[in-house]
């Protein structure tokens, strides 16, 4: 349990260090490779860790983030991924598209956490 908490803290700290100054999103080939890696993971927690690590290092588009989210079953984990990855989104003008599958309450939670 302590190691999981430690990983979450490390990833949270890394958000402020990486991905906040996106100049361009990753290429389609690179993204497809990352997506396949995530697809092979067995559970949402493992997928969350990988997606968080990738988005801390790479700039992604809203559509790419949505592709990652589609691999997750648990809705709360989807919210967490958006919160964790939002700073790495290149095309923030498409945020509305990203928020379409969330309730108003979840949208407000996400937006509060990324400001």
Where do the protein language model's features map onto the residues?
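Sec-dependent N-terminal signal peptides
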Residues: 4-15
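General marker for long, soluble alpha-helical cores
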Residues: 18-115
């Amino acid at each position: 349990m302590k190691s999981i908490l430690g990983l979450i803290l490390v990833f949270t700290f890394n958000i402020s260090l990486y991905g906040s100054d996106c100049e361009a999103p990753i290429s389609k080939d690179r993204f497809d490779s990352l997506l396949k890696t995530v697809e092979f993971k067995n559970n949402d927690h493992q997928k969350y860790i990988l997606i968080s690590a990738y988005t801390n290092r790479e700039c992604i588009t809203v559509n790419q983030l949505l592709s990652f989210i589609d691999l997750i079953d648990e809705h709360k984990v989807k919210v967490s991924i958006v919160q964790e990855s939002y700073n790495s989104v290149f095309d923030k003008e498409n945020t509305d598209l990203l928020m379409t599958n969330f309730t108003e309450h979840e949208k407000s939670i996400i937006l509060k956490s990324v400001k």
